[in-house]
A protein has these predicted regions:
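Non-catalytic alpha-helical scaffolds and adjoining flexible linkers that form interface surfaces
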Residues: 1-23, 27-185
Length: 185
């Protein structure tokens, strides 16, 4: 067998693969989004301990022709139970699903992992509207991608001293009074 690889990861999804195995989807600190084949885990007691959104230390074997990493060992680092609030659970799941779906270069995945980890920890401590925290997370992801979304600046002139007067539903652009008066909108 090849050399083991060790990383931290947040569990995004569990899927049954066979009578005794699972396919686990993680967002890891060092590799980004990975799918892991966990052979025999459904027979072991570990399956009851696996919880979505939890942080785990993983020992993985590199993928072979199947493209799935093979799970060597797994241990829980941090449990996150957001099941008491469906809004908080949905906001956490959306963030993890977003990062798992994006194509993130391997060298940048530690930055995104740190953002996700701090977001999930912060979400646990807050009461109230989770959608506001989700938007804050999304804006930070946009900034990391180099496309900041400034809610106080006009999309045409980039002025922040004028108040925003209109929003274009088609493009999402924000316009100040001056640009709205001179534009085709």
């Amino acid at each position: 067998m090849k050399q083991r690889f060790r990383s931290l990861g947040c569990l995004a999804r569990l899927s049954e693969y066979s009578e005794s195995s699972l396919i686990l989807r993680f967002f890891t600190r060092d590799l980004g989004a990975v799918s892991v084949l966990a052979k025999g885990i459904r027979r072991a007691q570990t399956r009851n301990q696996l919880m979505a959104l939890g942080e785990y230390e993983l020992n993985l074997y590199p993928p072979t022709e199947s493209g799935l990493y093979l799970l060597g060992e797994i241990s829980s680092v941090k449990e996150r139970d957001l099941s008491a609030s469906p809004q908080h659970w949905a906001a956490a799941d959306c963030a993890l699903e977003l990062l798992s779906s994006l194509i993130i270069p391997t060298e940048e995945s530690p930055v995104y992992y740190t953002l996700l980890d701090s977001y999930l920890d912060f979400l646990q401590t807050r009461k109230g509207s989770a959608i506001l925290l989700w938007w804050r997370f999304l804006l930070r992801v946009f900034n990391f991608f180099g496309t900041p979304f400034d809610l106080l600046a006009c999309s045409l002139c980039q002025a922040t001293d004028e108040s925003i007067a209109a929003w274009d539903r088609g493009t999402g652009a924000l316009f100040c009074h001056n640009c709205l008066a001179t534009s085709e909108y």
